[in-house]
Amino acid sequence: MTNDYSNLFLPYTLNNGVTVPNRLAVAPLTLYCQNPDGTVSDDERDFLKHHGEGFGLYVTGATLVDAGGQSFYGQARALSEADLPSLRERVEIVRSLGAIPIAQLFHGGILANPDFLPDRQPRGPSATPDGKASELTEAEIESLIQKFAYAAELCMKAGYAGVEVHGAGPFLLPQFVSEATNRRTDRWGGSLENRLRFPLAVLDAVIDVKEKAGRKDFIIGYRITPEQPGEKGITMKETLAAVSEITKRPIQYLHVSQQNFFHAVRRGADTSKSRMELIHDAVAGRSAVIGAGELVTGADFERAVTSGWTEFAAAGQSVMLNPDLARLVRAGRDDLIDRFRDESKNDSCHLPKVLWPWVPDKDGPAKLP
């Protein structure tokens, strides 16, 4: 039996006039398989060539903007012109799949891995209680803003169609937003307005790169995680205020990252409603919205897009497990979409062994290292 998901393959025109061929997006994936210097390895090349064909948008994950922000082994980077050949190769592969390539701009902040850092010292908005990370100085904050901008410039030069500012998860930008990790008493901390100052300054600097280049067609996105656990974690009320500020800027999309697309609000807003509904209402049509979170099959994507809470549906694990995912969705063959890693398909799946713990297998959910 097949299903009709043809509406997922209708084009969508962003607010800058760029038309995306369909409503499916590859979520940014940290691949852990680049070469140690961040250049394209054989494993990364093989993965990129065999995953994401037929998607509308393809966000390549966690592109490093500063050597002091590296959290993962290898990790794609946009630090200098020496990185252009690998950036260009990623662009060429993604375009060959028929997708629009977007580079996600990343800094790990206090979650940078000391083993990968020049001085073995992670830095963030505030020093951590255990002393493992130190507080960024005013000068370092200003420098990081410009490094995000320079990374965007390099990605533009490499041929990327746009960039996504990584303001989701537990990394640098949300570290500034969250009272749990930002205990500053200067203009970068305290009130929500002050805690949003750094992420918005980064976004403004990236937008400035686009405007100075006269590239109306260049896509700018921003990724958020709606809520954090803990007494001082980011609340839905704070997120809705942030969304309002972010989408006042001329961005093309807001990307919402969470465990499950349909999760209801935890606190800080109407808990009878989904986070996605409230966020989409707050965006109020100023940009597109991309939703992610346990979207695996065509039925999942269809339910997300027809909810009215998102313009695009993004997948990560399902893309890793199903090299031909978009083709299967277009054919309405949810019955052929794998939800778990099948060892008999390891070769045809083109999934580097380092990524196996990041996808569920028949014995249970992903076993993250």
What are these regions, as identified by a protein language model?
Residues M1-P369:
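Flavin-dependent oxidoreductase catalytic cores
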